[in-house]
Amino acid sequence: MRAAAISMPRLNKMPGMFFSASPKDSKEHSHSLLDDKKQKKRPKTFGMDVKTYLRSMIPHLESGMKSAKSKDILSAEEVMQWSQSLEKLLANQTGQNVFGRFLKSEFSEENIEFWLACEDYKKTETDLLHNKAENIYKAFVHSDAVKQINIDFHTRESTAKKIKTPTPTSFDEAQKVIYSLMEKDSYPRFLKSNIYLNLLNDLQANTLK
């Protein structure tokens, strides 16, 4: 505000000009000051907590887990293929979303979130492995993790040791356990669920139109 005061014309040299500015000029000046204040108030980012990390890593799950793509993109045949194997289901991003929605209804969405986190981790550049490994471990594997996955003590301890000197395969053992759990437990129920069957029926009905 001090800079604005200095730049104003002196009143004794310009009589009658103090209130002569047009409303438009006043508004533009006010907007400029507000913009400056907004820029100064922008928060600085010093790092990501676990929740922010998860959102950035698997945004299509954290954004509400849509039940399907628009019907002109997703076909009934594609959805039918999801019933062939869990592998085919998870190979499709919409399949991941729909399955994630089902797991959320069963309060076990941490399983697919961990599986996806592991898939993302394998593609990570070497210099970023340590930081990402710690985030995944804290989010899913640690005994106090907010989204703790259901793995045995041996696998948990083994994973903890591996991330001390992380490699792209550090979470493979734990990921296989969770995949097997989803394949034998959640996946068969998913194929019988209203979430899956209603989606398939809707798409088949649209195909006949």
From Swiss-Prot:
<comment type="function">
    <text>Regulates G protein-coupled receptor signaling cascades, including signaling downstream of the N-formylpeptide chemoattractant receptors and leukotriene receptors. Inhibits B cell chemotaxis toward CXCL12. Inhibits signal transduction by increasing the GTPase activity of G protein alpha subunits thereby driving them into their inactive GDP-bound form.</text>
</comment>
<keyword id="KW-0963">Cytoplasm</keyword>
<dbReference type="GO" id="GO:0009968">
    <property type="term" value="P:negative regulation of signal transduction"/>
</dbReference>
<feature type="region of interest" description="Disordered">
    <location>
        <begin position="19"/>
        <end position="42"/>
    </location>
</feature>
<keyword id="KW-1003">Cell membrane</keyword>
<dbReference type="GO" id="GO:0007186">
    <property type="term" value="P:G protein-coupled receptor signaling pathway"/>
</dbReference>
<dbReference type="Pfam" id="PF00615">
    <property type="entry name" value="RGS"/>
</dbReference>
<keyword id="KW-0343">GTPase activation</keyword>
<dbReference type="InterPro" id="IPR036305">
    <property type="entry name" value="RGS_sf"/>
</dbReference>
<dbReference type="InterPro" id="IPR044926">
    <property type="entry name" value="RGS_subdomain_2"/>
</dbReference>
<dbReference type="GO" id="GO:0001965">
    <property type="term" value="F:G-protein alpha-subunit binding"/>
</dbReference>
<keyword id="KW-0734">Signal transduction inhibitor</keyword>
<feature type="domain" description="RGS">
    <location>
        <begin position="85"/>
        <end position="200"/>
    </location>
</feature>
<dbReference type="GO" id="GO:0005096">
    <property type="term" value="F:GTPase activator activity"/>
</dbReference>
<dbReference type="GO" id="GO:0043547">
    <property type="term" value="P:positive regulation of GTPase activity"/>
</dbReference>
<keyword id="KW-0472">Membrane</keyword>
<dbReference type="GO" id="GO:0005886">
    <property type="term" value="C:plasma membrane"/>
</dbReference>
<dbReference type="GO" id="GO:0007165">
    <property type="term" value="P:signal transduction"/>
</dbReference>
<protein>
    <recommendedName>
        <fullName>Regulator of G-protein signaling 1</fullName>
    </recommendedName>
</protein>
<comment type="subunit">
    <text>Interacts with GNAI1 and GNAQ.</text>
</comment>
<dbReference type="GO" id="GO:0009617">
    <property type="term" value="P:response to bacterium"/>
</dbReference>
<dbReference type="GO" id="GO:0005829">
    <property type="term" value="C:cytosol"/>
</dbReference>
<dbReference type="GO" id="GO:0009898">
    <property type="term" value="C:cytoplasmic side of plasma membrane"/>
</dbReference>
<feature type="compositionally biased region" description="Basic and acidic residues">
    <location>
        <begin position="24"/>
        <end position="38"/>
    </location>
</feature>
<dbReference type="GO" id="GO:0061737">
    <property type="term" value="P:leukotriene signaling pathway"/>
</dbReference>
<dbReference type="InterPro" id="IPR016137">
    <property type="entry name" value="RGS"/>
</dbReference>
